[in-house]
Amino acid sequence: MIVSMLAATDLARILDGRRIADDLLDALKTRVDARVAAGKLPPTLAVVLVGSDPASVVYVRNKRRAAEKVGIKAYDFDLPEATTEAELAALIDRLNADPKIHGILIQLPLPGIPDAHRLIQRVDPRKDVDGFHPQNVGHLALREFGLRPCTPRGIVTLLGHTDRPVRGRNATIVGVSNHVGRPMGLELLMAGCTVTSCHKFTPPQMLEAAVRQADILIVAVGRPGVIPGEWVKPGAVVIDVGINRLDDGRLVGDVGFESAVKRASWITPVPGGVGPMTVATLMQNTLEAAEAADC
């Protein structure tokens, strides 16, 4: 059973990503409604899906539903799995040139296309609402305005809903992917944390030590239970980005939840923690892309 408040047993409070994401979407809808009332176009999002991977289909459906809730107009581009890189590049070029399109979402992975990064770089950075383009990551590194990667930005929003300070805290990130771990480090540096990043070359004893000293622990590896809950520092805030399906069908994170919940002050559930925030932040970026296009 998920714990919703700090109980007498000192279990962690749950960072309910679904509730916080819904609140963010409601706030975005208010801004979109005001925009439309002022005679401006509603924000628009081109959603590009290649193939029919079940997980990708679910993710795209969730993003389309969120767009509809906020008042963002989504344009669907559902392409066959045999779509070539050249064909996808041509579509991206058309969307880049279309002033009625504010945001472009390329759902990853792209079947049959070995270098998705090359296509991500082709998206106009001003329409890169995923925040994956090197120019947008560079803006984040330089603490400049840009479209920030959705999952790290959503995690920062989650951290703001705890009663724990962020500035001056020790933060450990486990996992250094381009889309989560690396930009997460930049976000936390900007927030005033002292950041330690761990990866596959980090010796096990060093990994354990880094986790045990973390006031804020963010794990994004994609391996169930890779971080034992017993390692969590008492009172730490734990953000579990991993989502893994076990043989029995259960979805679990990268952190041993049953033991971590007894040590942390706040912890995200899996599912229902980081995932909804990523989707809501995508809508936030899309609205900001539309607002920037007005200037």
Swiss-Prot record:
Q: Which InterPro entries match?
A: Aminoacid_DH-like_N_sf (IPR046346), NAD(P)-bd_dom_sf (IPR036291), THF_DH/CycHdrlase (IPR000672), THF_DH/CycHdrlase_cat_dom (IPR020630), THF_DH/CycHdrlase_CS (IPR020867), THF_DH/CycHdrlase_NAD-bd_dom (IPR020631)
Biological pathway: One-carbon metabolism; tetrahydrofolate interconversion
The name this protein goes by in its record:
Bifunctional protein FolD
Please list the reactions this protein catalyses: (6R)-5,10-methylene-5,6,7,8-tetrahydrofolate + NADP(+) = (6R)-5,10-methenyltetrahydrofolate + NADPH; (6R)-5,10-methenyltetrahydrofolate + H2O = (6R)-10-formyltetrahydrofolate + H(+)
Enzyme Commission (EC) number: 1.5.1.5, 3.5.4.9
Task: Give the molecular function GO annotations.
Answer: methenyltetrahydrofolate cyclohydrolase activity; methylenetetrahydrofolate dehydrogenase (NADP+) activity
Cystine links in this protein are none
Give the family this protein belongs to, as stated in its UniProt record: Belongs to the tetrahydrofolate dehydrogenase/cyclohydrolase family.
Q: Where does NADP(+) bind?
A: G175, V176, S177, I243
